């Protein structure tokens, strides 16, 4: 089953647009795990157990594991996700952006070593940096487009004088991803909830692409505004889901032994807010 099909199935199964980001910071773990990087898997597994029936996807961020020499725990977590939440797709948040044989190895890392359903990529080096991932049938490649950070405007909002219509960079990227780059229907886009007008513009330019939308929760993005900008209930205009990510607001909702229960309550509330805005 393709990444797109798995997303649509998970959306229906769990009645959800919510993605929980797995960004483990040992310094924020509850006692007695506080500061203990050997407990990264245990912490993430508890979050998964508490939220797996509430989400459209999970999104582990590879840097939070690599910084603590915990790639083995990430492998263990990915295997755990496949076992306890087999119907929930997993997006490896890696934001890779190289070309050629290096990109081939990054694709192998994402799809063979970690067996992710999709991976995030930086397309700054052009289609050469995307194409190696499209050789993996059924896997998703989600390209940074209009990101949630304020500094994203430094490049993404600049107009391209040499392109017809002088679109902004993020607009041109959305058009490429919707059109000539999407050779096998595997692409999606990352667009931040913190810029709802740009989010609506990307959805208009890329009506069939899945959108991974960070920025709801700790970054201040509004759930209702996000859904209004990106969701299209009319199947004639789009068959692509939106994947609204929340990481810190869910992971660190509680700082004591009941942290998983607190995470579930925040996930429930966020899912409800997103669904109410459809």
Swiss-Prot record:
GO process annotations (BP): 'de novo' pyrimidine nucleobase biosynthetic process; 'de novo' UMP biosynthetic process
Lyase listed as a keyword: yes
Transmembrane segments: none
Residues at the active site: 95
Reactions catalysed: orotidine 5'-phosphate + H(+) = UMP + CO2
Domain of life, per lineage: Bacteria
CDD domains: OMP_decarboxylase_like
GO molecular function, one term: orotidine-5'-phosphate decarboxylase activity
Pathway membership: Pyrimidine metabolism; UMP biosynthesis via de novo pathway; UMP from orotate: step 2/2
InterPro entries: Aldolase_TIM (IPR013785), OMPdecase_AS (IPR018089), OMPdecase_type-2 (IPR011995), OMPdeCOase_dom (IPR001754), RibuloseP-bd_barrel (IPR011060)
Family annotation (PANTHER family): OROTIDINE 5'-PHOSPHATE DECARBOXYLASE (PTHR43375:SF1)
NCBIfam families, per the entry: pyrF_sub2
Protein name: Orotidine 5'-phosphate decarboxylase
């Amino acid at each position: 089953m393709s990444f797109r099909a798995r997303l649509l199935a998970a959306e229906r199964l769990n009645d959800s647009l919510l993605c929980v980001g797995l960004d483990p910071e040992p310094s924020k773990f509850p006692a007695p795990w506080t500061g203990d990087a050997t407990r990264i898997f245990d912490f993430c597994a508890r979050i998964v157990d508490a939220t797996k029936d509430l989400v459209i996807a999970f999104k582990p961020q590879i840097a939070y594991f690599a910084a603590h020499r915990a790639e083995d725990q990430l492998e263990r977590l990915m295997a755990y996700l496949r076992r306890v939440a087999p119907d929930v797709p997993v997006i490896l948040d890696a934001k890779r952006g190289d070309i050629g044989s290096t990109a081939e190895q990054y694709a192998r890392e994402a799809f063979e070593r970690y067996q992710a359903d999709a991976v995030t990529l930086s397309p700054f080096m052009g289609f050469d940096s995307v194409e190696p991932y499209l050789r993996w049938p059924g896997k998703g490649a989600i390209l940074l487009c209009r990101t949630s950070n304020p500094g994203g405007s430094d490049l993404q909002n600049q107009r391209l004088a040499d392109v017809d219509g002088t679109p902004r960079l993020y607009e041109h990227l959305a058009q490429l991803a919707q059109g000539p780059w999407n050779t096998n229907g595997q692409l999606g886009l990352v667009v931040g909830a913190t810029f709802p007008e740009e989010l609506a513009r990307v959805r208009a330019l890329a009506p069939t692409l899945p959108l991974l939308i960070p920025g709801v929760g700790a970054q201040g993005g509004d759930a209702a505004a996000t859904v209004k900008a990106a969701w299209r209930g009319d199947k004639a205009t789009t068959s692509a889901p939106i994947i609204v990510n929340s990481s810190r607001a869910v992971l660190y909702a509680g700082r004591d032994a009941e942290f998983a229960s607190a995470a579930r309550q925040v996930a429930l509330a966020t899912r409800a807010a997103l669904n109410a805005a459809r």
